[in-house]
């Protein structure tokens, strides 16, 4: 019988909207340091995680090691029973609950790996568990939790609403709230990964451990142990450019709250860090590396090449950061260095693989996108292809621009992508070759607009009066698209529209809207009230070329 109940919920950004302010009341005095803070060395070494968790192996990354000229290892947390490290922290906290509170049950707010970790732990410990998720949570996620025996409550339109309901149910029924990351026992559970690493890898050669950062529980736990036992080993965190709460917080010396977070690496999409995790990270984190979506996709491919396993975007963050770190520091002799990346999880949505495959080549620098303007006359296409040859062309799109066909002054805009061995080294030479042939060319490999909506632009009509173009990100839930269209249709004409689902909780929409200049303020108010992330692309060079014929 199903344990799913469904009142109502929105976006799937998992974060602590109201940081847990509980301190160390549940920690026994002999596990506290003289200053009253937890002794994480003791907490980690006495952790109870191995009742349910595996000591995961370390896999040598042979191909990456050869490519980067270093000794690379992958810590395989994707091989845990719930395919994520989250089981360690959830189980350790729940295993330390006193018997008099266990019978009441536990509760958590999560639609991701933490939910499965709590549900799995509760089943093993015979503790009733309730998991609160947003109403728009994909069925595959809540059904997995339901299958593990937890009661699933779907509530609210976003994680703020779901968390508020979680807190309400916790207080009403006396349920123990199992936080995502901000609890000493959760942190200590994650820290057992550090214990294993120092047993599995030669400490003398281990130079750095790369760890993905969401709320900070994993890096805080691993760092707390490593810095006590092998302080010379660097702890390097990895975040995305659009979800970098730790980087900004460490720079400012206090926790900051992000107004928006990127959702591709949704397992690490956190707006505000935990209080305790941030306190620890200030002490143990040596450096933060920021990576892009394309670099994460390339890292997923790298992991697949090494292991034939597919990790989720957040699970590949550490590898993306490791690769970027090594490539960004040519002054370091990496040949004698051992670097380890923790693969944090493998709960990948299958539908995302198409997107990952498309972007991986860009991320690893083996494919480039170029827009070229060539004369509209016989022989131009052939000349263009000769410049690219012998590289393999992966996509070729064309749009006639200005001038009349029977005249010789017409121009064609060409969108072309092709394979390269090393984008950084080859692209400048390629652009010089194009220029020498009399072709204007622009590298758009790092321009998000054409990467998300390129095919739609080719063949567009002439410029539209007062047209403004925007990229929107919509939560994949009933009513999101309707809300947008209803808000626009009564006021302004939609001149262009392209929707694309990436196989995740978020869909990308490209929209052109005719907005007279005297209505700009009213339109801005509409955008603000919409409450969806957006970026204006009206001045984007690719839009101008393909849609306006400039």
From Swiss-Prot:
- The UniProt annotation puts the region (Disordered) at 1-21
Which protein is depicted? Threonine dehydratase, mitochondrial
Question: Mind telling me which PROSITE patterns this protein's record contains?
Answer: ACT_LIKE, DEHYDRATASE_SER_THR
Q: Which gene encodes it?
A: ILV1
Presence of the UniProt keyword Transit peptide in the record: yes
Q: Which organism is it from?
A: Blastobotrys adeninivorans (Yeast)
One of its GO biological process terms is: L-serine catabolic process
EC number(s) recorded for this UniProt protein: 4.3.1.19
What is the protein's quaternary organization?
Answer: Homotetramer.
